[in-house]
């Protein structure tokens, strides 16, 4: 990825080969660019919980995120609750985390910061 483009500005490219799975050093580097996200599932996923005032705002966020996921062709696992949504990205075909998970995490954080 071009260093002049932020993760939130980048677009997903298919990552289906095992060599696209990120190593520990690159994971640690990219984690600094997505505050609030953490490794989960024994380091095989990237997860963040988003808080909302009510169920309507939670679902509005989830629906907006669904549109972003569709456009990027990379879809998170989500748990939706009253006042919160747990979003989890991983690249299933490689059995871990790739750069596209960080791109989508950054886009998700940007959506949340917009107050959707």
UniProtKB/Swiss-Prot annotation:
CDD domains in the record: PCD_DCoH_subfamily_a
The keyword Membrane is assigned to this record: no
Coiled coil: none
Catalytic activity as recorded in UniProt: (4aS,6R)-4a-hydroxy-L-erythro-5,6,7,8-tetrahydrobiopterin = (6R)-L-erythro-6,7-dihydrobiopterin + H2O
InterPro entries: PCD_sf, Pterin_deHydtase
The enzyme's E.C. designation: 4.2.1.96
Family statement drawn from the similarity comment of this UniProt entry: Belongs to the pterin-4-alpha-carbinolamine dehydratase family.
UniProt name for this protein: Putative pterin-4-alpha-carbinolamine dehydratase
């Amino acid at each position: 990825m071009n260093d002049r483009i932020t993760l939130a500005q980048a677009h997903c490219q298919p990552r289906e080969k095992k060599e696209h799975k990120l190593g520990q050093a690159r994971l640690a580097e990219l984690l600094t660019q997505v505050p609030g996200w953490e490794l989960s599932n024994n380091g095989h996923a990237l997860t963040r919980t988003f808080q909302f005032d009510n169920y309507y705002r939670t679902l509005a966020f989830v629906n907006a995120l669904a549109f972003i996921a569709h456009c990027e062709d990379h879809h998170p696992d989500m748990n939706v609750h009253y006042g919160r949504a747990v979003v989890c990205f991983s690249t299933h075909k490689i059995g871990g985390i790739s750069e596209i998970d960080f791109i989508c995490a950054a886009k998700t954080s940007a959506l949340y910061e917009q107050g959707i």
